[in-house]
């Protein structure tokens, strides 16, 4: 076995993803119900059974209450799934849980439209509504 003395450099994007946190800012129009729709077409994770990569488009729709999600923070959060071994179902449920905890919306829907693999196309959709 050959050992390398080369230092492995962490790329700035990897560092931003690792250090990323979900950031919010005050809703500029509290009291008005309006829908924010975000599409994230480059979601990736790894199958917890095979280790093969899974790809999806994530659709996020929410009605904010007092806080709005910062878009770059959402992007970095979604990119953090890249090397995680996680099922489609758990991933979409976890995304919903984390985003709801961060911004406490009036309602939110997260849909994961996964690319077909092995002739199977999966869409997972979860919803939250404040009581």
Curated annotation (Swiss-Prot):
Pathway(s) where this gene product acts: tRNA modification; tRNA-queuosine biosynthesis
EC numbers, comma separated: 1.7.1.13
GO molecular-function terms, A-Z: preQ1 synthase activity
Pfam family, one: QueF
InterPro entries: GTP-CH-I_C/QueF, NADPH_dep_7-cyano-7-deazaG_red, QueF, QueF_type1
Catalytic activity reported: 7-aminomethyl-7-carbaguanine + 2 NADP(+) = 7-cyano-7-deazaguanine + 2 NADPH + 3 H(+)
GO cellular component, one term: cytoplasm
This protein's UniProt keywords: Cytoplasm, NADP, Oxidoreductase, Queuosine biosynthesis
Catalytic residues as annotated in Swiss-Prot or TrEMBL: 47 (thioimide intermediate), 54 (proton donor)
General function of this protein: Catalyzes the NADPH-dependent reduction of 7-cyano-7-deazaguanine (preQ0) to 7-aminomethyl-7-deazaguanine (preQ1).
Protein name per its UniProtKB record: NADPH-dependent 7-cyano-7-deazaguanine reductase
